[in-house]
Every structure is written in C-alpha cells, then in structure tokens.
Swiss-Prot record:
One of its GO terms (molecular function) is rRNA binding. Pfam families: Ribosomal_L6. Keywords: Ribonucleoprotein, Ribosomal protein, RNA-binding, rRNA-binding. Part of the 50S ribosomal subunit. Belongs to the universal ribosomal protein uL6 family. The keyword Ribonucleoprotein applies. The keyword Isomerase does not apply. Transmembrane segments: none annotated. This is Large ribosomal subunit protein uL6. The lineage of its organism: Bacteria, Pseudomonadati, Pseudomonadota, Betaproteobacteria, Burkholderiales. It comes from the Bacteria. GO terms for biological process: cytoplasmic translation. GO terms for cellular component: cytosolic large ribosomal subunit.
Length: 177
C-alpha cells in the first residue's frame, strides 16, 4: 500500500465530505469542490477520517490510492483554510491593479495586459508591485499564478519581470570583451 495513502485524511469541523459511487464532494466555508473517484481506489469514511485503499494489488491501484488521498486532502485544506500564491513585479514602471475579477498589468509592453480571473479565484494587489492569488482549489491557484508569471517571466540578466515571492533568480554575467 502507498505510504501516502496509509495516512487518513482528517476532516475538520465545518467541512462536509460526501463520497458517492463516482464522485467525492467537499463542502466548507471556502466553497464546494468535487473530484471524480477512481475505480482502482476504495474510499471509506469513519469517525471524522477518510481512508484510502487500493481496490486490487496492482501497482497502478497502489499509486492511484496515494494520489487520490493527496488530492482529497488538498480539497479539504482548500475549503477550510484556502490557498494563496504571492507574486512580485520587479522592474521600472511595472505595476499591477486588481479591479473585481480582472487583473491589469503594466509590464513594459506598449499596451496594458488584462487577465480575467475564473470563478472561485480572487486576486488582490496589496501594493502596486505585489499580486496575491487566493482560492480553494490548489491546482487552479497555481495555474493562474503561472499564467500571470508567463506574461513577463524574469529575465536572467537584470532579473526584471514577474516572479513568485519566494523565487530566487540566478543573475547571469554579461558578455566580456
């Protein structure tokens, strides 16, 4: 059995998990998330804990039990606490402004770049050079943060661009004569 799948998922107070034949739904303060259940994994719920076991002894079922356990754990954490990703804009004149479900970026192009946020994702700008992406779905938060970063990734010579707050950019040395 997968080492990850051996650990049960603890369901905190205020979070409701329903396991149907083909769907796992997690409902909480942060919203509702659902996931298709894999036929290779048996999910059992008892005394506030979810347990995941492979349906058979195949390697694929073993691996899938650990994967499904971690996905459900991320859903439970997302609806109870939420996830956030911080980005910073480095460069002269680079700034961001959040207006409702849109993010406006001025990052050195001849035009401002507007990015629409999907439902369930909120974006804030505490300062003009910081962007915070929040949401209940860990995968979507990371995906939106990656799309924002892709507008102007950090360049290796001066480090200008959009980067994750905890990202370290290795600056290259310029060509010498």
């Amino acid at each position: 059995m997968s080492r990850v799948a051996k650990m049960p998922v603890t369901i905190p107070a205020g979070v409701d998990v329903s396991v149907k034949d083909d769907q796992i739904a997690v409902k909480g303060a942060g919203g509702t998330l659902s996931l298709a259940q894999n036929v290779l994994v048996k999910v059992t719920s008892s005394d506030g804990k979810l347990r995941f076991e492979p349906a058979n002894e195949s390697r694929q079922a073993n691996a899938m039990s650990g994967t499904l356990r971690q996905l459900v754990n991320n859903m439970v954490l997302g609806v109870s606490k939420g996830f956030e990703k911080k980005l910073s804009l480095v460069g002269v004149g680079y700034k961001a402004a959040a207006a409702g479900a849109k993010l406006n970026l001025v990052v050195g192009y001849s035009h401002p770049v507007n990015i629409d946020m999907p439902a369930g994702i909120t974006v804030t700008t505490p300062t003009p050079t910081e962007v915070v992406v929040k949401g209940a779905d860990r995968q979507r938060v990371g995906q939106i943060a990656a799309e924002i970063r892709a507008v102007r990734p950090p360049e290796p010579y001066k480090g200008k661009g959009i980067r994750y707050a905890d990202e370290k950019i290795t600056i290259k040395e310029t060509k010498k004569k």
